A protein has these predicted regions:
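NAD(P)-dependent short-chain dehydrogenase/reductase
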Residues: 129, 156-211, 216-218, 224, ...
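C-terminal substrate-binding subdomain of Rossmann-fold SDR/epimerase-dehydratase oxidoreductases
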Residues: 200, 204-324
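Rossmann-fold cofactor-recognition segment
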Residues: 43-55
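A hydrophobic alpha-helix adjacent to the NAD(P)-binding/active-site core of NAD(P)-dependent oxidoreductases
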Residues: 48, 90-91, 105, 113
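NAD(P)H-binding glycine-rich loop region in Rossmannoid oxidoreductase-like domains
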Residues: 53-93
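Active-site helix of classical SDR
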Residues: 143, 147-150
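Conserved Rossmann-fold NAD(P)-dependent oxidoreductase catalytic core, especially the SDR/UDP-sugar
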Residues: 73, 99-143
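N-terminal Rossmann NAD(P)H-binding glycine-rich loop of SDR-like oxidoreductase domains
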Residues: 3-23
Length: 324
């Protein structure tokens, strides 16, 4: 089965390519910009292509030249921090590109199309204790979540109107390699871990923040399971642990992974709710029922794996001190 992965140099897309390559799956990896030598060398069996997926003619030409069986559509303007300043660009990327790929899938009768979406389509669900099941009605409140919901609706339309095996898998607050960031849109785990490894004491607010954090390897594993399952019986799936983890739990996991880390939190949710509102955890049994997949990393195991990767790549984050 030849798998098309869009957004293949991104956070989740890159991990999907990595895992698919380890399974010896034929992979066509698409990115908006030219792929560097490092990516090409890291994935020697992958066919790398450059394409602006919002360009209908370019997408049709690419898919006509390359036989494709399934697609995991990871390319996106990935959060509100990037979407709000450029709504037209967010619409073109998150909605237009999805429409182009779905039409290509219809014309070529692809076996499977998986759209990666987000828990942000539940922006209006502020009860952090109540799990959000797949059949709950979305409620969007910003540019990013609106464009992703539009993409979901298009995916469902091609499923119901044209018989395409197309489904949406929603993910939430993904963390892990290769992200190195202390920016609020990435959430507390990358920020805490980076500063802890740099021996920077963390004393700040945010203790009341909670989210359904998912380690990147688990997100990619679940998406591959959806792409390769014999049948997807539902239009919507949720991928995650089904619970929210507090910022305090994230801090404890970082302290365990980085002995000696100082993280002391006071009340509030900022800065983590600057671009994303609090919401309940994504939950549901559909993905496990249809694919057999469950996330394999606990919060602590995911943070430890992330810390190990960062220690192995100090050149990416070092600020004059060696991590412990």
């Amino acid at each position: 089965m030849t798998l098309l992965v869009t957004g293949a140099t991104g956070h989740v897309g890159g991990e999907i390519v990595r895992q698919a390559m380890k399974r010896d799956m034929p992979v066509i990896a698409v990115a908006r910009d030219a792929v560097g030598e490092a990516e090409a060398q890291a994935f020697p069996s992958v066919k790398w292509l450059q394409c602006d997926l919002a360009d209908t003619d370019a997408v049709m030409a690419l898919t006509a030249r390359n036989p494709i069986d399934a697609c995991i559509h990871a390319a996106a303007i990935s959060n509100e921090a990037y979407a709000r300043p450029d709504p037209r660009g967010a619409i073109a990327t998150n909605v237009g590109a999805t429409a182009n790929l779905l039409e290509a899938a219809r014309l070529a009768s692809w076996r499977r199309f998986v759209l990666i979406s987000t828990g942000s389509v539940f922006s209006l669900n502020s009860d952090t204790t109540r799990p959000i099941l797949e059949d709950q009605a979305p409620g969007v409140a910003n540019v990013y979540s609106t464009t992703k919901l539009c993409a979901e609706l298009l995916t469902s339309m091609y499923r119901t109107e044209y018989g395409l095996s197309a489904s949406t898998v929603r993910i939430s607050w993904v963390f892990g390699p290769p992200i190195i960031s202390d920016q609020p849109m990435r959430g507390p785990i990358p920020s805490y871990l980076l500063r802890a490894l740099q021996s920077i004491a963390i004393r700040e607010g945010g203790a009341e923040f909670a989210a359904s954090f998912t380690y990147v390897a688990d997100a990619a594993g679940g998406l591959l399971a959806a792409a390769t399952a014999p049948e997807l019986r539902h239009p919507i799936y949720h991928l995650g642990h089904g619970v929210n983890f507090t910022a305090g739990q994230a801090a404890a996991a970082v302290r365990s992974a980085v002995p000696g880390a100082v993280i002391e939190l006071t009340g509030g949710t900022e800065p983590w709710t600057r671009y994303t509102s609090l919401r309940g955890p994504l939950a549901g049994d559909r993905l496990r029922a249809d694919t057999g997949y469950n996330p394999t990393h606990t919060l602590e195991a995911g943070v430890r794996a992330y810390a190990d990767w960062m220690r192995a790549h100090p050149e990416l984050w070092r600020a004059g001190e060696t991590p412990g």
